[in-house]
């Protein structure tokens, strides 16, 4: 919901600015959720532009992170053939397009954005001129390390005042990156939070469970649902808990999601989990913190290991 809401706001702001060269740069903390959001943006843009988007998709939308292929698909260049020299030329053109952020909407990571602003390497600076005069959306902004808040605040202020750049910070738990003097709250959450639709989750706390053995005993005794999500703080703990639960719950399909998985396997496993949940299969998912930034799995019951406030 908030992803589409912020994109709609950015488009309205772009219309008000009456600047066709203004780009929207949508930034996320993890590569694991970029593909999901990118596909949703593809659907929206294709719905409105149809053939224009099909002919030149990379004019309108681009995905960029460290795993992104530098060779773009769906090229409609009539001169594109298997000739070795021309293929290399196409590769260089594609690489330049990806690394310079020329399209109207870019989906990328915090790392790519901040490297382009703070780095002095030519590779990162290729896109600097396209960051200027743009609308930058930072989703799940609470994942930024607090040690960088002051530096980011100063840089954002300079970009906003001198380079006509707008920053939209999105999160359910807004950190103190920007002060009230330089930032505007777009939404007052109080009226929304009083709506009964948000009163759909019951939270229970148990601080007596201080280790994985105690949790496993409690979980084995009390768990009665058809599906559950267990989130812990480390990859090592996720694997340990997964092995224990898999042995005890033979009639459930158990999945472990951690950064030990390569991105392709992670995406494949998330798709499989989502399909199982949609058909109400008996399933238990154990994960570390990679699940917390918009991966989009909905289980009947969730368990969260004790963690810092910005992770809750």
Language model region names:
Residues 21-46, 65-68, 176, 235:
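Conserved Walker A/P-loop ATP-binding site and its immediately adjacent core
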Residues 172-223:
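Interdomain hinge/linker at the junction between the two RecA-like core domains of SF2 helicases
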Residues 23-34, 222-246:
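Conserved strand-helix element at the start of the C-terminal RecA-like helicase core
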Residues 5, 9:
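Hydrophobic positions on the alpha1 helix immediately C-terminal to the Walker A/P-loop
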Residues 62-74, 235-236, 254-270, 288-292:
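Conserved helicase motor
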Residues 111-113, 124-158:
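SF2 helicase catalytic motif II
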Residues 260-261, 282-312:
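Conserved RecA-like helicase motor core of SF1/SF2 enzymes
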């Amino acid at each position: 919901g908030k992803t589409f809401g912020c994109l709609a706001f950015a488009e309205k702001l772009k219309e008000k600015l009456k600047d066709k060269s203004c780009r929207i740069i949508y930034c996320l903390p993890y590569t694991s959720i970029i593909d999901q959001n990118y596909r949703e943006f593809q659907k929206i843009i294709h719905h409105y532009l149809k053939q224009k988007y099909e002919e030149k998709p990379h004019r309108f939308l681009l995905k960029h992170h460290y795993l992104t292929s530098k060779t773009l698909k769906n090229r409609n260049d009539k001169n594109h053939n298997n000739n070795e020299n021309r293929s290399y030329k196409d590769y260089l053109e594609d690489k330049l397009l990806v690394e310079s952020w020329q399209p109207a909407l870019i989906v990328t990571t915090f790392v790519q954005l901040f490297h382009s602003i703070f780095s002095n390497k030519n590779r990162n600076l290729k896109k600097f001129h396209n960051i200027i005069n743009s609308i930058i959306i930072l989703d799940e902004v609470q994942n930024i390390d607090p040690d960088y808040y002051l530096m980011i605040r100063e840089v954002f202020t300079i970009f906003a005042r001198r380079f006509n750049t707008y920053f939209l910070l999105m999160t359910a738990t807004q950190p103190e990156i920007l002060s009230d003097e330089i930032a505007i709250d777009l939404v007052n959450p109080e009226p929304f939070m009083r709506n009964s639709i948000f009163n759909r989750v019951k939270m229970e706390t148990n601080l007596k469970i201080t280790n994985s053995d105690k949790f496993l005993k409690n979980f084995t005794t009390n768990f009665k649902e058809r599906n559950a999500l267990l989130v812990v703080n480390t990859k090592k703990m996720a694997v340990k808990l997964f092995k224990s639960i898999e042995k005890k719950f033979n009639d459930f399909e158990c999945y472990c999601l951690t950064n030990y998985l390569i991105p392709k396997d992670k995406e494949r496993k998330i798709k499989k989990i989502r399909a199982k949940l949609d058909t109400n299969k008996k399933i238990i998912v154990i994960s570390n913190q990679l699940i917390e930034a918009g991966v989009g799995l909905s289980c009947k019951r969730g368990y969260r290991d004790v963690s810092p406030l910005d992770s809750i």
